[in-house]
Amino acid sequence: MRDVSIIGVGITKFGELWDKSLRELGLETGLAAINDAGITSNDIDALYIGNMAAGSTLQQEHVSALIADYCGLANQNIPATRVEAASASGGLAIRQAYMAIAGGFIDVAVVGGAEKMTDVSDSESSYTVSMGSDEQWEAKAGATFTSLHAIIAQNHMLEYGTTREQLSSVAAKNHYHASLNPMAQFPFALDPAAVSKSGMVSTPLRMLDCAPNLSLIHI
């Protein structure tokens, strides 16, 4: 196995990016990552894009080839692969590229995670996200990702004695990290007490425990 390094990055701001299409965001971040790495398109052996929802929210499948085309990589004749694993799609795309490079199959990969979740209504995006659950036994029964994670949290509390204060500290920690990132959707810190006092969504998860809908691309 060979060592693998991340040599360049490009990222959009996290949030409601209504003024730009998925392909425009892909072009912006793809070129930024390539320039940051100091490479050219001739150096790239493969493209991996993690995406869950474009087929539902944008009626656009085959997004890896779309982004390759708009980034000027189509003439390089490299494999462009879409990776889907619900909310972990971007992370799994990194894993696939890592395995290909570490195994010696390729030398350089462009890897990205891309979603446009705010171009549709909240109900439509919630329905799309619920497709990542079991359609027959969970989604059809009305389960959402939030309610399923609430059940997981309840079981964790029962098994390990996890407290409300500990759950709030997780959200507060995440918001603190966001306060250090100018590209974050909500770049400000939160006190754990504010998390505990926010509105209930699905017991025991409150509003500030839950991830908001957003659009972004990072490569």
Positions of PLM-derived features:
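Conserved catalytic cysteine-centered active-site region
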Residues: 2-5, 54-109, 116-148, 186-212
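Generic N-terminal amphipathic, Lys/Arg-enriched alpha-helix
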Residues: 3-18
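Short, well-ordered amphipathic alpha-helical segments that serve as non-catalytic structural scaffolds
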Residues: 23-38, 63, 67, 93, ...
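Phosphate/pyrophosphate-binding loops at sites that engage ATP/ADP/AMP, CoA/4′-phosphopantetheine
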Residues: 31-45, 156-161
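Beta-strand segments within the central parallel beta-sheet cores of soluble alpha/beta enzyme folds
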Residues: 41-51, 78-85, 109-113, 165-172
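N-terminal leader/propeptide and maturation segments of large enzyme subunits in energy/redox metabolism
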Residues: 143-195
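Conserved small/polar residues in nucleotide/adenosyl-binding loops
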Residues: 217-219
